[in-house]
Protein backbone atom coordinates (compact mmCIF):
# COMPACT_ATOMS: atom_id res chain seq x y z
CA UNK A 1 0.00 0.00 0.00
CA UNK A 2 1.90 3.10 -1.17
CA UNK A 3 1.11 6.41 0.51
CA UNK A 4 2.32 9.88 -0.47
CA UNK A 5 1.59 12.95 1.63
CA UNK A 6 1.94 16.63 0.80
CA UNK A 7 1.05 19.57 2.97
CA UNK A 8 -1.01 21.90 0.81
CA UNK A 9 -2.06 22.96 -2.65
CA UNK A 10 1.34 24.58 -3.34
CA UNK A 11 2.88 21.11 -3.25
CA UNK A 12 0.97 19.95 -6.31
CA UNK A 13 2.87 18.93 -9.45
CA UNK A 14 1.77 19.58 -13.05
CA UNK A 15 -1.38 17.79 -14.17
CA UNK A 16 -0.75 14.40 -15.73
CA UNK A 17 2.60 13.82 -14.02
CA UNK A 18 3.62 11.66 -11.07
CA UNK A 19 4.36 13.19 -7.68
CA UNK A 20 8.05 12.46 -7.13
CA UNK A 21 9.59 12.62 -3.65
CA UNK A 22 13.14 12.58 -2.38
CA UNK A 23 13.39 9.19 -0.70
CA UNK A 24 16.63 9.91 1.19
CA UNK A 25 17.94 6.76 2.89
CA UNK A 26 15.33 4.57 1.23
CA UNK A 27 18.04 4.58 -1.43
CA UNK A 28 20.04 2.15 0.70
CA UNK A 29 17.69 -0.87 0.31
CA UNK A 30 17.72 -0.29 -3.46
CA UNK A 31 21.52 -0.29 -3.53
CA UNK A 32 21.51 -3.39 -1.33
CA UNK A 33 19.17 -5.10 -3.80
CA UNK A 34 21.51 -4.27 -6.69
CA UNK A 35 24.50 -5.52 -4.71
CA UNK A 36 22.87 -8.80 -3.76
CA UNK A 37 21.90 -9.41 -7.38
CA UNK A 38 25.63 -9.45 -8.14
CA UNK A 39 26.21 -11.82 -5.22
CA UNK A 40 23.60 -14.26 -6.51
CA UNK A 41 25.26 -14.22 -9.93
CA UNK A 42 28.63 -15.05 -8.42
CA UNK A 43 30.09 -11.67 -9.38
CA UNK A 44 30.68 -10.49 -5.81
CA UNK A 45 31.74 -12.24 -2.61
CA UNK A 46 30.17 -10.59 0.42
CA UNK A 47 33.26 -11.36 2.51
CA UNK A 48 35.97 -10.34 0.05
CA UNK A 49 38.10 -7.42 1.28
CA UNK A 50 37.11 -4.15 -0.35
CA UNK A 51 40.79 -3.50 -1.08
CA UNK A 52 40.70 -6.37 -3.58
CA UNK A 53 37.62 -4.93 -5.29
CA UNK A 54 39.07 -1.43 -5.66
CA UNK A 55 42.52 -1.93 -7.22
CA UNK A 56 42.94 1.82 -7.70
CA UNK A 57 41.96 2.66 -4.14
CA UNK A 58 39.21 4.90 -2.82
CA UNK A 59 39.13 8.68 -2.50
CA UNK A 60 36.64 9.85 0.10
CA UNK A 61 34.81 13.11 -0.62
CA UNK A 62 34.44 15.08 2.59
CA UNK A 63 32.06 17.76 1.27
CA UNK A 64 29.71 15.33 -0.43
CA UNK A 65 26.58 17.39 0.14
CA UNK A 66 28.16 20.70 -0.88
CA UNK A 67 26.77 20.07 -4.33
CA UNK A 68 28.19 23.18 -5.99
CA UNK A 69 31.65 23.14 -4.39
CA UNK A 70 34.82 21.56 -5.70
CA UNK A 71 35.44 18.19 -4.05
CA UNK A 72 37.66 17.98 -0.98
CA UNK A 73 39.01 14.44 -0.90
CA UNK A 74 41.29 12.18 1.10
CA UNK A 75 42.70 8.84 0.04
CA UNK A 76 41.55 6.04 2.33
CA UNK A 77 44.50 3.90 3.52
CA UNK A 78 44.65 0.51 1.85
CA UNK A 79 45.04 -1.28 5.18
CA UNK A 80 41.69 0.18 6.20
CA UNK A 81 40.00 -1.05 3.02
CA UNK A 82 41.43 -4.51 3.73
CA UNK A 83 39.31 -4.69 6.88
CA UNK A 84 36.05 -3.85 5.13
CA UNK A 85 33.72 -6.12 3.14
CA UNK A 86 30.44 -5.69 1.31
CA UNK A 87 28.78 -7.53 4.21
CA UNK A 88 30.02 -5.05 6.81
CA UNK A 89 29.00 -2.12 4.60
CA UNK A 90 25.48 -3.46 3.99
CA UNK A 91 24.89 -4.36 7.64
CA UNK A 92 26.29 -1.11 9.06
CA UNK A 93 29.00 -2.97 10.98
CA UNK A 94 31.91 -1.43 9.07
CA UNK A 95 32.97 0.97 11.82
CA UNK A 96 32.61 3.88 9.41
CA UNK A 97 30.74 6.97 10.66
CA UNK A 98 27.44 8.10 9.23
CA UNK A 99 29.26 11.02 7.58
CA UNK A 100 32.75 12.50 7.79
CA UNK A 101 32.36 16.03 6.38
CA UNK A 102 35.28 17.73 8.10
CA UNK A 103 38.19 15.35 7.77
CA UNK A 104 39.58 12.04 6.52
CA UNK A 105 37.46 8.92 6.71
CA UNK A 106 38.36 6.87 9.80
CA UNK A 107 37.05 3.82 11.62
CA UNK A 108 35.18 4.24 14.89
CA UNK A 109 35.76 0.58 15.81
CA UNK A 110 37.03 -2.64 14.27
CA UNK A 111 34.77 -3.78 11.43
CA UNK A 112 32.27 -6.43 12.49
CA UNK A 113 32.43 -5.56 16.18
CA UNK A 114 29.07 -3.81 16.45
CA UNK A 115 26.33 -1.89 14.64
CA UNK A 116 26.61 1.80 13.77
CA UNK A 117 24.56 3.43 11.02
CA UNK A 118 26.76 4.63 8.17
CA UNK A 119 26.00 6.58 5.03
CA UNK A 120 29.71 6.61 4.20
CA UNK A 121 29.63 2.83 3.92
CA UNK A 122 27.08 2.97 1.13
CA UNK A 123 29.02 5.63 -0.76
CA UNK A 124 32.04 3.33 -0.61
CA UNK A 125 29.85 0.45 -1.80
CA UNK A 126 28.74 2.64 -4.72
CA UNK A 127 32.36 2.80 -5.90
CA UNK A 128 32.62 -0.98 -5.61
CA UNK A 129 29.53 -1.43 -7.80
CA UNK A 130 30.90 1.03 -10.35
CA UNK A 131 34.18 -0.88 -10.52
CA UNK A 132 32.49 -4.28 -10.85
CA UNK A 133 29.91 -3.27 -13.45
CA UNK A 134 31.67 -0.47 -15.29
CA UNK A 135 28.47 1.58 -14.93
CA UNK A 136 27.66 4.62 -12.79
CA UNK A 137 24.94 3.93 -10.24
CA UNK A 138 22.14 5.60 -12.22
CA UNK A 139 22.93 3.56 -15.34
CA UNK A 140 23.34 0.30 -13.41
CA UNK A 141 20.09 0.82 -11.49
CA UNK A 142 18.23 1.74 -14.66
CA UNK A 143 19.34 -1.37 -16.56
CA UNK A 144 19.07 -3.75 -13.61
CA UNK A 145 15.96 -2.49 -11.83
CA UNK A 146 14.17 0.64 -13.00
CA UNK A 147 13.56 -0.38 -16.62
CA UNK A 148 12.71 -4.07 -16.01
CA UNK A 149 10.15 -3.16 -13.33
CA UNK A 150 8.78 -0.15 -15.18
CA UNK A 151 9.86 2.32 -12.50
CA UNK A 152 9.48 5.34 -14.77
CA UNK A 153 9.75 7.95 -12.05
CA UNK A 154 12.85 6.75 -10.19
CA UNK A 155 16.42 8.03 -10.48
CA UNK A 156 19.54 8.53 -8.39
CA UNK A 157 20.17 12.05 -9.70
CA UNK A 158 18.09 14.96 -10.91
CA UNK A 159 16.85 14.85 -14.50
CA UNK A 160 14.50 17.12 -16.44
CA UNK A 161 11.66 14.63 -15.90
CA UNK A 162 12.37 14.40 -12.17
CA UNK A 163 12.64 18.17 -11.78
CA UNK A 164 9.28 18.71 -13.53
CA UNK A 165 7.46 16.33 -11.20
CA UNK A 166 9.35 16.86 -7.94
CA UNK A 167 7.14 17.70 -4.97
CA UNK A 168 8.54 20.70 -3.06
CA UNK A 169 9.88 19.62 0.31
CA UNK A 170 9.18 21.83 3.31
CA UNK A 171 10.72 22.75 6.63
CA UNK A 172 8.69 22.46 9.82
CA UNK A 173 7.78 26.15 9.41
CA UNK A 174 6.59 25.61 5.83
CA UNK A 175 9.54 27.06 3.90
CA UNK A 176 10.42 25.19 0.70
CA UNK A 177 13.57 23.13 1.21
CA UNK A 178 15.03 20.47 -1.06
CA UNK A 179 18.30 19.25 -2.53
CA UNK A 180 18.79 18.65 -6.25
CA UNK A 181 21.50 16.03 -6.66
CA UNK A 182 23.48 16.47 -9.91
CA UNK A 183 25.31 13.21 -9.22
CA UNK A 184 24.47 9.90 -7.57
CA UNK A 185 24.88 9.31 -3.84
CA UNK A 186 24.03 5.69 -3.04
CA UNK A 187 23.14 6.50 0.56
CA UNK A 188 20.58 9.21 -0.05
CA UNK A 189 19.96 10.65 -3.53
CA UNK A 190 17.04 8.48 -4.68
CA UNK A 191 14.10 10.25 -6.31
CA UNK A 192 10.98 8.11 -6.63
CA UNK A 193 7.23 7.85 -6.13
CA UNK A 194 5.38 5.80 -3.50
CA UNK A 195 4.04 3.54 -6.27
CA UNK A 196 7.47 2.98 -7.82
CA UNK A 197 8.96 2.12 -4.44
CA UNK A 198 6.08 -0.22 -3.69
CA UNK A 199 6.81 -2.05 -6.96
CA UNK A 200 10.44 -2.36 -5.91
CA UNK A 201 9.41 -3.83 -2.56
CA UNK A 202 7.06 -6.28 -4.28
CA UNK A 203 9.95 -7.48 -6.43
CA UNK A 204 12.14 -7.94 -3.37
CA UNK A 205 9.46 -9.82 -1.42
CA UNK A 206 8.90 -12.16 -4.37
CA UNK A 207 12.60 -13.03 -4.63
CA UNK A 208 13.09 -15.60 -1.87
CA UNK A 209 16.78 -16.18 -2.63
CA UNK A 210 17.65 -12.52 -2.38
CA UNK A 211 15.37 -11.96 0.60
CA UNK A 212 17.09 -14.80 2.45
CA UNK A 213 20.41 -12.97 2.01
CA UNK A 214 18.85 -9.81 3.45
CA UNK A 215 17.54 -11.54 6.56
CA UNK A 216 20.21 -14.17 7.27
CA UNK A 217 22.10 -13.76 10.57
CA UNK A 218 21.19 -10.11 11.26
CA UNK A 219 23.18 -8.15 13.83
CA UNK A 220 21.53 -6.66 16.93
CA UNK A 221 21.04 -2.91 17.11
CA UNK A 222 22.42 -1.66 20.46
CA UNK A 223 19.89 -0.66 23.12
CA UNK A 224 16.99 -1.69 20.87
CA UNK A 225 15.42 -5.02 21.93
CA UNK A 226 13.96 -7.03 19.04
CA UNK A 227 15.62 -4.75 16.46
CA UNK A 228 18.34 -6.11 14.18
CA UNK A 229 20.02 -5.17 10.93
CA UNK A 230 20.33 -7.39 7.90
CA UNK A 231 21.87 -6.60 4.53
CA UNK A 232 20.36 -3.27 3.60
CA UNK A 233 17.27 -3.41 5.83
CA UNK A 234 16.37 -3.11 9.47
CA UNK A 235 14.65 -6.21 10.87
CA UNK A 236 12.11 -6.41 13.69
CA UNK A 237 11.28 -9.70 15.40
CA UNK A 238 8.20 -9.19 17.55
CA UNK A 239 5.52 -11.62 18.76
CA UNK A 240 6.51 -14.39 16.33
CA UNK A 241 6.39 -11.95 13.41
CA UNK A 242 9.26 -10.52 11.40
CA UNK A 243 9.35 -7.24 9.52
CA UNK A 244 11.88 -5.51 7.29
CA UNK A 245 11.90 -1.74 7.40
CA UNK A 246 13.85 1.41 6.60
CA UNK A 247 13.39 5.14 6.92
CA UNK A 248 14.53 8.22 5.06
CA UNK A 249 15.30 11.70 6.35
CA UNK A 250 16.66 14.56 4.25
CA UNK A 251 16.17 18.27 3.77
CA UNK A 252 12.44 18.79 3.21
CA UNK A 253 11.34 15.13 3.22
CA UNK A 254 10.68 12.12 5.46
CA UNK A 255 9.86 8.53 4.42
CA UNK A 256 9.24 5.04 5.76
CA UNK A 257 8.92 1.58 4.23
CA UNK A 258 8.00 -1.66 6.00
CA UNK A 259 6.95 -5.18 5.05
CA UNK A 260 5.58 -8.09 7.07
CA UNK A 261 7.68 -11.11 6.10
CA UNK A 262 4.92 -13.49 7.17
CA UNK A 263 2.10 -12.04 5.05
CA UNK A 264 4.21 -10.06 2.52
CA UNK A 265 2.01 -7.02 3.19
CA UNK A 266 3.99 -3.81 2.72
CA UNK A 267 3.57 -0.07 3.21
CA UNK A 268 5.51 2.88 1.80
CA UNK A 269 4.86 6.35 3.22
CA UNK A 270 6.44 9.58 1.98
CA UNK A 271 5.96 13.06 3.45
CA UNK A 272 7.13 16.28 1.80
CA UNK A 273 7.85 17.92 5.14
CA UNK A 274 10.59 17.76 7.75
CA UNK A 275 7.98 17.25 10.46
CA UNK A 276 6.35 14.46 8.47
CA UNK A 277 7.78 11.42 10.24
CA UNK A 278 4.88 11.08 12.73
CA UNK A 279 2.48 11.02 9.78
CA UNK A 280 4.58 8.38 8.02
CA UNK A 281 4.69 6.27 11.19
CA UNK A 282 0.93 6.50 11.58
CA UNK A 283 0.44 5.26 8.02
CA UNK A 284 2.68 2.29 8.73
CA UNK A 285 0.80 1.39 11.91
CA UNK A 286 -2.59 1.63 10.21
CA UNK A 287 -1.72 -1.30 7.96
CA UNK A 288 0.90 -3.11 10.06
CA UNK A 289 -0.22 -2.50 13.66
CA UNK A 290 2.95 -3.76 15.35
CA UNK A 291 4.37 -3.06 17.91
CA UNK A 292 7.30 -1.65 15.94
CA UNK A 293 10.33 -1.02 18.16
CA UNK A 294 12.44 -0.01 15.17
CA UNK A 295 10.31 3.09 14.69
CA UNK A 296 11.26 4.21 18.20
CA UNK A 297 14.97 4.54 17.39
CA UNK A 298 16.30 8.06 17.86
CA UNK A 299 17.50 8.03 14.26
CA UNK A 300 13.95 7.74 12.94
CA UNK A 301 12.91 11.38 13.23
Where are these regions (language model features)?
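Well-ordered alpha-helical segments within folded domains of soluble proteins
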Residues: 30-32, 121-126, 195-199
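Short, mixed-charge aromatic SLiMs
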Residues: 56-64, 145-155, 220-225
Amino acid sequence: MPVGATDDESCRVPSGTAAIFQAASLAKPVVAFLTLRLVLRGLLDLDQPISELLPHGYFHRQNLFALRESPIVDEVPRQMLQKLTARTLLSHTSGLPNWSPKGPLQLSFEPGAQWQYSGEGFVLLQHVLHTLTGKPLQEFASVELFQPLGLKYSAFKITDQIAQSLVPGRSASGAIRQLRFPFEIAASSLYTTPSDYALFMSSLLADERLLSLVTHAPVPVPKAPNVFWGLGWGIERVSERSYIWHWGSITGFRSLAMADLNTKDAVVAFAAAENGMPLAKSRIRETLPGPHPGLELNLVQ
